[in-house]
Structures are given as C-alpha cells and as structure tokens.
Design a protein with these regions (language model features):
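Conserved beta-strand hairpin/beta-sheet module of binuclear metal-dependent hydrolase folds
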Residues: 2-51, 132-144, 149
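Active-site HxH/HxHxD metal-binding segment of metal-dependent hydrolases
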Residues: 15-20, 39-117, 139
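Metallo-beta-lactamase
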Residues: 34, 39-40, 117-208, 212
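Short helix-to-turn junction characteristic of helix-turn-helix DNA-binding domains
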Residues: 213-217
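Short acidic, hydrophobic short linear motifs in intrinsically disordered regions
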Residues: 218-230
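Short, positively charged loop/turn segments that connect secondary-structure elements
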Residues: 230-242
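Short, hydrophobic-biased segments on the C-terminal half of alpha helices
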Residues: 245-249
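Conserved small/polar residues in nucleotide/adenosyl-binding loops
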Residues: 255-256
Length: 257
C-alpha cells in the first residue's frame, strides 16, 4: 500500500501555547516538500529526516514563530535543500532569527512536481509573513497558525494584526478545498463552516471589547481582559491580552468581509 500524499508529524513540544504540539507535514512520496519542520528538537528532526527517506527536496515554513521554523536551518543544512517562506515586516520577540529563505514565496506562487501542486497564499494576521499552502490535487489547505484545531489563535501586536487576520480568513473563501491541516491539532473538515465560525467569533469578541470599554473611563489591558475574556480560564488571560490589544489597535474597516 502506498503511503498518503500528506503525512502529519507532531513535534513533542506540547504546551499551553502549542496544544498537543506543532504539526510538521511531509507532502509527496518521491519528491517531498517538508512544511513547518518545527522547533529545534533532535528527536523531531531525526524523525522527519527518517520519514523523508532521502526524498525531501525543499522546506517551506508557514511563518517564523519559534515553534514552527527553527528546525528548517538544521534540516536544510543536513540535506542541502532550499528553505522557502517569507520574512516578517515588524520584528518581535516571537520570531526565529535563524530562518533565512533562499526563495521568498509570494501570494499565488506555484510549486509543481509530478505528484502535486502547492499554491502559496499570503495570509497575514497571526504573523505578517504567514502563508497557507493549498495542495490542489488533495483539495487540502495547510493553514499553519492561521487556523488551529482546539483553540483560536493568538494575534500579537505589532507584527500580528486583527484587521489582516480577519481579511485573510475571508480570503480563504475564494479557494476550493475540503480539508484543513492545521499547525496544531487534528485535521478539520467542512472548512468554510470553520472559517465562518472563526470570523463570527472574532467579531463577537470585538463587540464585547467595545461594550466593556464603555464601562471604564480609564483601564489597562490587564484589567479589561478580565471582563472581555470572562469565558476563558483566568490562567490564559496573560495570553489573551495579546489578542485583546490586537482588537484595540485594529482599524474598523475590512476588505473581504
């Protein structure tokens, strides 16, 4: 039996930020594209190289947060294969400084092999350099941290943008796919329902931000998060503050909604 065209391999880095761990993907059987090789953990690096069976030809990253791209440099040097992705527009402490792409992937770029075609889709929001990858033959979208299973994603200002994030979610409606392979968690079906739910959830949260702001003459983000995210475990409020501030920094207008 031939192996699946898309293999998901989860890194052993589970945490409150990463859920069960960061998902790496091996695309293809004979001409493999490795997507999001993950954190620099020897066990995970060795597993990916072993599963690749000497057939990994290139490495893509969805974005350069430190749970997604640090292994790219290591594996790229071991296998002598090129790194492809984008660099951030506004640097912050979340970024992997070791990622230096040989090729900058633009919106709509295609990588074509005898087995599959990958389309690069620029989806800023979670990070300014975030990309999703459509595997056309499988009608599958690799979403990195644009969409996760089990949690909504953190939008951390200044590199993260709530306005860009919502526009990028709406952009996915233009593509034909029936399965989401996320950066964290298991695959998701009925993708348009997932996209619509996330957009609605974020807009409802924004309404709550505006409503709660009216109750204060002066308030800090740390105080405001308690009422805006009162449905979220208080242990997660320090993380939720990032998304709260992204709502506060966001202009009102959206392009695609």
């Amino acid at each position: 039996m031939s192996k699946e065209l898309i293999q998901q391999v989860t890194a052993p880095n589970g945490s409150v930020f990463t859920g069960s761990g960061t998902n790496s993907y091996l695309i293809g059987r004979e001409d493999i594209t490795l997507v999001d090789p993950g954190p620099k953990i020897d066990e995970h690096i060795e597993k990916l190289i072993k599963l690749g069976e000497g057939k990994i030809k290139r490495i893509f990253v969805t974005h350069t947060h430190r749970d997604h791209s640090p292994s790219a440099k290591v594996i790229g040097e071991i296998l002598n294969v090129p790194l492809m992705g984008r660099l951030v527009e506004k640097d912050d402490t979340l970024q992997d400084k070791t990622f230096k792409p040989e090729r900058i992937l633009g919106h709509g770029d295609l990588i074509e092999t005898a087995e599959y075609t990958i389309e690069s889709i620029h989806t800023p929001g979670h990070a300014s350099n975030h990309l999703c990858f459509l595997i056309r033959e499988e009608k599958a979208m690799l979403t990195g941290d644009h969409i996760m299973n089990g949690s909504t994603v953190v939008i951390a200002h200044p590199d993260g943008s709530m306005k860009d994030y919502l526009n990028s979610l709406a952009l996915l409606r233009k593509y034909s796919f029936n399965k989401i392979w996320p950066g964290h968690g298991a695959f998701l079906e009925d993708p348009m329902a997932v996209v619509d739910w996330i957009i609605d959830h974020r807009l409802e949260r924004e309404k709550k931000v505006i409503s709660e702001l009216n109750n204060f003459s002066s308030v800090t983000s740390e105080e405001l998060v308690k009422s805006v995210y009162d449905d979220v475990d208080s242990k997660l409020h320090p993380i939720a503050v990032w998304s709260l501030e992204a709502h506060l920094y966001k202009p009102v207008s959206y392009t695609h909604l």
